[in-house]
C-alpha cells in the first residue's frame, strides 16, 4: 500500500487515478508481474470504488488477473457479478467480442461442480443463466462448437423443460444458420414435447384445411378487440411455449410449407384456448398471409392483420415487437396499402434488430429492407451498397439460406 501511495497510483483521499493504474500495469514486461499487478489493482478498486463506471474498469483488471484470483479466492460470486455486468454493458453498446471475453472469464470463475447447489459458492440459476448467455454470445460471433458444448451442459443439468428451452432455441438457431433445417426443427419439436406440446406426428394439407376452417368459424364469431385484450398468461410454461412456437414458425417458413401451415393454426389455437402469449402478434401475421394466399379469404385476412397491428402496439417485448413488425410489414402490409408506406417501419426495424444481437433477425430485417427498396425502384447503386455494407458484421451471411439468399439475389 505504501508503494502504491508513493508512486501516486493510490491517492491519499482514496481516490484512484485509473489511467495511472493502467499505465503501471502496461509498463511491466514479465507476464507474471503484469498479472499480479492487475490482481492488486482489482483488489484495491473493489475496496475503495463502488460506482458503475469503476465496476466496468475493475472488470478488465479482474479478467486479466483471473488466474491469481481463482487460485487465491474460494468464493468468487462478487467477481462473477462484476464480470457479468461488464459483459452486459459491452453487449448493449455493441462490443460483442468484448462481451464474450468477459463471459468466458466469468465461466472460468465457476466452481468445479457449478450445477450442484449443495456446494460452496454454487448457485444453479446463475450457472444456468451464464451458460446460456455465453453460448448465445459465442454463436453470434461464429464460435458454434463452443456454443454447442455449453448448451450440452444445460441439457445435461437443466432441472426443468422451461430451464432448457432457451438452450434448445439457440441450438435450433445454430443449425438453421448452417442450413440444416431438419436438425433445427428437431430441436424445437423436442423442446415443445418437453413442454407438453406434441406436434411431430404426420399431417396433410387436407387435415390442416379442416383445422383452419374450424379456427375460422371461431374467429368469425369473436370480436377482434376481445382477442387483442386477452391478457398474457402468468404460467411460465405457456409463455415459453409461445416463444418456442415463434422460433419454429421462422424455421419452417423457409423449406416446409405444410409444417408452417400446421404451426400457424396450432399457435393461434394455443393462444385462444390455453393462454395468451406475446408472440401471437407474429402468428397473426403468418395466419393472415395464409388466408390471403391459400384461401383468398380477404375478410378473415384483414381481420387478422388488424389484430396483428393491435397486438404489436401492445407488445411489451422489444425482440418480439421488432420481429413481428418485419413479418407484418413485409408479408402483409403491402397487401393493405402502398408498398412505400411500409418503408419507415422497416427502417426502424433494421436499426432495432442490429442492437438485439440476433444474426437471424438482423439478416431477415436487412434483406426485407433491400427487397423493398428494389421493388420501389430506388437508386440501384445505393441498393447495392446497402446490401454490401449492412450485413458485413454478420458472420458468413451470404451462405445463410434464409435472409442471406434474398440479399444476395437483390445485390
Predicted segments with their positions:
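Alpha-solenoid helical repeat architecture
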Residues: 12-13, 51-56, 94-99, 118, ...
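Short secondary-structure boundary elements
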Residues: 1-101, 105-113, 194, 206-230
